C-alpha cells in the first residue's frame, strides 16, 4: 500500500472518531436550549431564536474567512483553537440567566465553529476520493444521528439535575476533541497550492455557479434548523414533558442507521445529485405543513418521520454536490463559503421561526409557522429546479455521482 493510500485510510478513521466527539458535544447541549430557556425559565421563543440564529450566522456566515485562513496556515491550529473556543461558549451558557449572556455564549460557540468547521469539511474532500464521498458523507450522517440520540439522552438526563451539568459535559467533550486533534492530526495542508487568504476568497466569489447554489440552499436550511427550535418545543408542548424530546432524536437515529447508506448506494448510480436533493426537500416541505394541526404525539412523530426521511434523501446529495463543485486550489475557502446558505437560512429560520411561533400562539393559529415553512420549502424547490435545468447546467454536474 502506498503512503498516500495509507494516509487516506488512517484519515478516514480519524475523521470518524473526531466527528463522533463533535456531534456528542454539540447534541448534549443544543437540543435542550429551547427547553431550558423557553419552558423552564419562561423566556419568549424569539429570544432563544435570536441566540440560536446568532450562533448559526456567526459560525456559517464567517465560514469563508475560517476556510481561507485554514487554506493559508493549515487545518490543525484552526481546529484546535475553534474547539477550545466552543468549550468556553458552553461553559458561559451554563451560567446564563439573562438573554445577553446566552447570546454571548452562542456568539463564542459560533466563532469556535467558524474556525474548526470549514477545515474539517475540507479534510473530508482532501482525504476521500470523489467516487467515495457520497457514501462517506452517508456514514458521517449516520454517526450524526446516533450521536444526536446519545447526546440528547445524556443531556436530558443531566437536565433533571442542573443545566450547568449539561453545559459542563458539552465543554469537556470539546476539550477532549481539541486534545485529540492536537495530538493526532498531522499538519496537513488543505489545498493543492498554498493559497493566500484574499486569493482563496476571490476565487470563490467569482464562481457564480457555486455562489448561486449556496444562496439557494438558504431556504432548505430554514426548514432543517427547526429540529433545534420549534420541533422540540412542539414535542414538549404535546407530551407535557421534555423527556419526550429524546424520542424525536431516536426516530432520526433509527431512520438514518437503517436507510441512509442503502438509499445513498442505490440512488447514486440512478439519479443526479440535484434531483436527490430536490426530492428530499419536497418531502420535508410536505411534512412541515400539517404539524401545527396535530393533536397527539403519534401524529406528530409520524410527520417528524416523514421530515427525517426527506432529510435522509437530501443531505448526502447536498454535501456531495457542494464538494464536487469546490475548486481544489481553495478547498477551505469553498467549504467555508458553502456554509453561508446555512448561516442565512439558519438565522432566518431560528429568529423568524421563533417569532412566528410566538405570533401563532398569540393569534391562536398554531399552524401559522408550519404553513410558512412549507411555502418556503416549495419556493426553494422551484429555485433549485430552475438553477439545475439542462439549459443552465453543464453536463458534468448533472451526472449521477458527479
Swiss-Prot record:
Q: Which UniProt keywords apply?
A: Cell inner membrane, Cell membrane, Membrane, Transmembrane, Transmembrane helix, Transport
Instruction: Write out the topological domains of type Cytoplasmic.
Output: 1-12, 117-138, 186-213, 265-276, 321-339, 389-402
The answer on whether this UniProt entry bears the keyword Membrane reads yes
Protein's cellular compartments: Cell inner membrane
Q: How does it sit in the membrane?
A: Multi-pass membrane protein
Keyword Cell inner membrane on entry: yes
Q: What is its main location?
A: membrane
According to the UniProt record, one GO cellular component term is: plasma membrane
Residue ranges in the Periplasmic topological domain are: 34-98, 160-164, 235-243, 298-299, 361-367
Membrane-crossing segments per the record: 13-33, 99-116, 139-159, 165-185, 214-234, 244-264, 277-297, 300-320, 340-360, 368-388
Q: Which domain of life is it from?
A: Bacteria
Family annotation (InterPro entries): MFS, MFS_dom, MFS_trans_sf, MFS_Transporters, Multidrug-R_MdtH
Q: Name one GO molecular function term.
A: transmembrane transporter activity
Family note:
Belongs to the major facilitator superfamily. DHA1 family. MdtH (TC 2.A.1.2.21) subfamily.
**This protein's name:** Multidrug resistance protein MdtH
Task: Name the source organism.
Answer: Salmonella schwarzengrund (strain CVM19633)
